[in-house]
């Protein structure tokens, strides 16, 4: 497996956006790239079988602006994952990430996701097979454990096995996955966060790139976590309040923050290109509803787009209308 130099690879992991089912599609990722030019982006999880047998353009196609971009795979069959990894490399991805953190019933029934944390030897076999099949970095996203697991040594042992098999980096969602009794949404909120386990993992294994995920919602929290880990991965915060992603990018890069209206306008050429291909406006605008979150007029922006983007023939002028009404509302509030 060919990897970038360790320091350069670790630097590229400082900021990333989590793979989120039904959210981080290609339109979302293009928007996030505009907000955070240096961030590492991740696809929604795609099962290895779907990559091999499905409509690849629909499932794993992406815009060149999205680099660096990782394909997150689901599955537990080493041979299928290896084949999917080869396809991902041919399509131009920068990283392959194996999902060992999703707790949904459907995923459990397929023997992948978080339940794999109880089968570290199998995960190691999957990682080794993908590493043998591709020159791309193969990484793992996992939880601290499942259900009532409360033994750091077991968690660290899982990490050691997958890293020993060739994993180049681990993303640690710093809470357990409860496989019974909680929905996937509740599993992102109810199990307590234990950042200290990720910190300890990095402290004890300084050569291993460790990215922290789970409950990170502000620039201040991100910068604090970066004192202990190589990177932070924003999830829901990057989606519901995407300007936080831009603010963190600015803090890490030293570049000045851009106004929300400027970032919105930067999205226009991509949106127009999709509209010209016959795609409905709603597929792009659903990812920008939170751009003015917490700002005067922010609710107006969300309302105009939510009510109008699904209508036949809706175009960029609706976004301009939403932006103008947001400005008008902000002026009235300030007056």
From Swiss-Prot:
Domain of life: Bacteria
Annotated signal sequence range: none
Keyword Ribosomal protein in record: no
UniProt EC number: 1.3.1.-, 1.3.1.91
Binding positions for FMN per the UniProt entry: 19-21, 72, 141, 173, 213-215, 235-236
Site entry (Interacts with tRNA), positions: 99, 185, 188, 299, 302
Cofactor or coenzyme needed: FMN
Alphabetically ordered keywords of this record: Flavoprotein, FMN, NADP, Oxidoreductase, RNA-binding, tRNA processing, tRNA-binding
Catalyzed reaction equations: 5,6-dihydrouridine(20) in tRNA + NADP(+) = uridine(20) in tRNA + NADPH + H(+); 5,6-dihydrouridine(20) in tRNA + NAD(+) = uridine(20) in tRNA + NADH + H(+); 5,6-dihydrouridine(20a) in tRNA + NADP(+) = uridine(20a) in tRNA + NADPH + H(+); 5,6-dihydrouridine(20a) in tRNA + NAD(+) = uridine(20a) in tRNA + NADH + H(+)
GO MF: flavin adenine dinucleotide binding; FMN binding; tRNA binding; tRNA-dihydrouridine20 synthase activity; tRNA-dihydrouridine20a synthase activity
SUPFAM superfamilies xrefs: FMN-linked oxidoreductases
Active site residues per record: 102 (proton donor)
InterPro entries xref list: Aldolase_TIM (IPR013785), DUS-like_FMN-bd (IPR035587), DUS_fam (IPR001269), DusA (IPR004653), tRNA_hU_synthase_CS (IPR018517)
Pfam families found in the cross-reference section: Dus (PF01207)
Disulfide bond sites: none
Keyword Flavoprotein: yes
Recorded family membership: Belongs to the Dus family. DusA subfamily.
Role summary: Catalyzes the synthesis of 5,6-dihydrouridine (D), a modified base found in the D-loop of most tRNAs, via the reduction of the C5-C6 double bond in target uridines. Specifically modifies U20 and U20a in tRNAs.
Name this protein carries in UniProt: tRNA-dihydrouridine(20/20a) synthase
Native source species: Xanthomonas campestris pv. campestris (strain ATCC 33913 / DSM 3586 / NCPPB 528 / LMG 568 / P 25)
Native organism taxonomy: Bacteria, Pseudomonadati, Pseudomonadota, Gammaproteobacteria, Lysobacterales
